[in-house]
Amino acid sequence: MHVGIVAQRGNERATSLAGEIREQLRALEVTVWVDTATAEALACAGECGRDTTAFTDCDLVVSIGGDGTFLFAARGAGATPILGVNLGEVGFLNAVAPADAVEAVREEVNRYRETGAVRCREVPRVVAAGDGWASTPALNEVAIQGEQRGHGHGVAVDVRVDGSQYEATRADGVLVATPTGSTAYNLSEGGPLVQPSVDALVVTEMCGADALPPLVTGLDSEIRIRVETLDDGGEGRVVVASDGGRLTRVDPPVEMTVTAADEPARVAGPAADFFEALSKLE
């Protein structure tokens, strides 16, 4: 069995716990890979350090930190189940407490050896695609905007859902979020909260002029977004951001579709209590 470990960068507690889990797994004769930054901190870079893109070949990935660390791990893990250990304040994706981390990982290793699979649930991701390009699949949201926000930097957008026009306006941008991502960027832009069990996508305009309220639509919807011009007179590019990290830049006018990705993310271990996590947002 192969297990990958991703720890929050610059967090000594996360690095220490990563080292402890690694030693426990090695005692169980599990092959362990660690993200390159953490491997350097643990002085095992040559032996166990790997880029997170290699974690697609693992049977389980352990993310230690906050939701940002989980998103970072998910970009490289592909279909590999990810178990999140929560060192942050909220933790919508990380359900395992640090004190329970070693035992939780051990349980999944034993389950894999007994059944050939770890316990996990599928979580949708979204992807934007245009003529000859596609964004990195996003666990939280895909945001489409100009290279800068604010007066003089917005975009003119036409948004259609399953062929019907939802909105045509000027805005800083528009984002399409999953239920998981409804608590993140979407919420800060005035979008609604959506329970993780709901099969849906959320379309939220970012500071739109005379904008309609955010729209919750089906998970199987096709959202077509056309960016006609930029408010600054057409100069600059359109930025498509996946989970705020991976950026795709395209020239306007551009048309793209945003849909649920073919391959969902897989989250291992127990599910976080959605409403308990919400209470920590206050």
UniProtKB/Swiss-Prot annotation:
Entry GO CC: cytoplasm
Catalytic residues in the record: 67
Keyword Amino-acid biosynthesis: no
GO molecular function: ATP binding; metal ion binding; NAD+ kinase activity
Cofactor(s) demanded: a divalent metal cation
Localization: Cytoplasm
Physiological role: Involved in the regulation of the intracellular balance of NAD and NADP, and is a key enzyme in the biosynthesis of NADP. Catalyzes specifically the phosphorylation on 2'-hydroxyl of the adenosine moiety of NAD to yield NADP.
Family, per entry: Belongs to the NAD kinase family.
The protein, known as: NAD kinase
